[in-house]
Amino acid sequence: MAQITMSDMLKAGLHFGHQTRRWNPKMKQFILTQRNGIHIINLFKSLDMIDKAYDFIKTTVAHNGTVLFVGTKKQAQEAIANQATRVNMPYVSERWLGGMLTNFQTVSKRVNRLKELEEMDFTDVHGSGLTKKELLLLEREKDKLNKQLGGIRNMNRTPSAMFVVDITKETLAVEEAHKLGIPVVAIVDTNADPDTVEYPIPANDDAIRGIELLTSLMADAVAEGLLERSGANKTEGEAAEQPMAAWEKELLTNEAPAEASAEAAAPAAAEGETAEAPKAE
């Protein structure tokens, strides 16, 4: 179960939706009320959906699956990159390139090209046999590829699941995932269609603190799944054949489980208590 409280969510401003005129009627079931022309999300229902998404991601990773973290909007880029890196999962925080999943073979070739360029010493003009201009162009190519594909450089196959921030922004990523039958967990605001993803999390997808909170939580689910996976390997006697990576050992020793809290908040609190102002549109 996810380690998150109602207070955490309120402080992060996750209850603020979009302006009422911009809502998607399919989000009605997750909306508590409206205040000053802004829809207020029912965080009790959000908690239920968070638990479902958390358990799904944990189970997926425990069964040797990978989760691709996706969030290219400015508010999400840092959280997506940091949290995915923390649990050694692939991510896309810059522009989603068409075919990243559906044309994975071609994308893999570009990743291999990136790795080749990273082996070069761009300061060694004499040893390379290239001119300074040629080396400069190759270095620029490397930087461009790293920006586009650096987050998926170690993704050797299409992911088992995807976590997305803002499905209205990442429509192409969600479409490609569905074409390949990849389940999607996503933060879904009041202007989006929750039916387009398997595990919608009704919440504000614009507040930086909210995005950081939920992305960190999904990364925690990955970490828990990795620990469960390593425990299963030991039980099956596979530990000697498949030794744990250094970063997995670090998770075991340094990742202290957060204490669960069953804090309850009245709906009135969900309408008023927050540290962030509603979205200006």
From Swiss-Prot:
One annotated GO biological process: translation
Bias-annotated ranges (Low complexity): 255-275
Keyword annotations: Ribonucleoprotein, Ribosomal protein
A GO molecular-function descriptor: structural constituent of ribosome
One cellular-component annotation, GO: cytosolic small ribosomal subunit
Iron-sulfur among keywords: no
PANTHER family: 30S RIBOSOMAL PROTEIN S2 PROKARYOTIC AND ORGANELLAR, SMALL RIBOSOMAL SUBUNIT PROTEIN US2M
Family statement drawn from the similarity comment of this UniProt entry: Belongs to the universal ribosomal protein uS2 family.
NCBIfam families according to UniProt: rpsB_bact
Protein name as annotated: Small ribosomal subunit protein uS2
Source organism per UniProt: Bifidobacterium longum subsp. infantis (strain ATCC 15697 / DSM 20088 / JCM 1222 / NCTC 11817 / S12)
Chain's gene name: rpsB
